[in-house]
Amino acid sequence: MGLETEKADVQLFLDDDSYSHHGDVDFADPEKFADSDHDRDPHRLNSHLKVGFEDVIAEPMTTHSCDKVWICSHALFEISKYVMYKFLTVFLAIPLAFVAGILFATLSCLHIWIIMPFVKTCLMVLPSVQTIWKSVTDVIIAPLCTSVGRSFSSISLQLSHD
């Protein structure tokens, strides 16, 4: 909420060919400017997903398969993991990003415009409710509990073994 001292990491690329002076927006090819060295998980949210072949398939020292089987299975594991991830992201990344965006926007809106005003209203009203509750307790509940306590205190039980 104060003065921002860090530079924002924002880049804007305009091509002379793709920028139209007539008001029509033509975007440049994003692959042209893709930075393959950029860290896509800077906060290490998914560091636990770095799974290698040796983390999944392991043969003890006493039982080994043939070297060619081991090499082929390792290659097949890596290729299938790579291809399936690319395939799934092509079909699922954009729809899931859209759904996640809608979900987070909805939750943010509910939190900002409904939940926090409700909480603040409750906190403003609580002193009045506390005063009323104390009065109800002093006028109704305390005398009732005192009467019931006095009534039960006059009861005595005597046990006899016959």
UniProtKB/Swiss-Prot annotation:
It is a peripheral membrane protein. Residues 1-86, 108-162 are cytoplasmic. The modification Phosphotyrosine is found at Y19. GO terms for cellular component: acrosomal membrane; caveola; caveolar macromolecular signaling complex; focal adhesion; Golgi membrane; perinuclear region of cytoplasm; plasma membrane raft; sarcolemma. InterPro entries: Caveolin, Caveolin_CS. Keywords: Cell membrane, Golgi apparatus, Membrane, Phosphoprotein. GO terms for molecular function: D1 dopamine receptor binding; protein heterodimerization activity; protein homodimerization activity; protein kinase binding; protein-macromolecule adaptor activity; scaffold protein binding. GO terms for biological process: basement membrane organization; caveola assembly; endoplasmic reticulum organization; endothelial cell proliferation; insulin receptor signaling pathway; mitochondrion organization; negative regulation of endothelial cell proliferation; negative regulation of skeletal muscle cell proliferation. The modification Phosphoserine is found at S20, S36. It holds the Pfam family Caveolin. Residues 87-107 dip into the membrane without crossing it. It is found in: Golgi apparatus membrane; Cell membrane; Membrane, Caveola. Homodimer. Caveolin-1 and -2 colocalize and form a stable hetero-oligomeric complex. Belongs to the caveolin family. May act as a scaffolding protein within caveolar membranes. Interacts directly with G-protein alpha subunits and can functionally regulate their activity. Caveolin-2 may function as an accessory protein in conjunction with caveolin-1. This is Caveolin-2. It comes from Microcebus murinus (Gray mouse lemur).
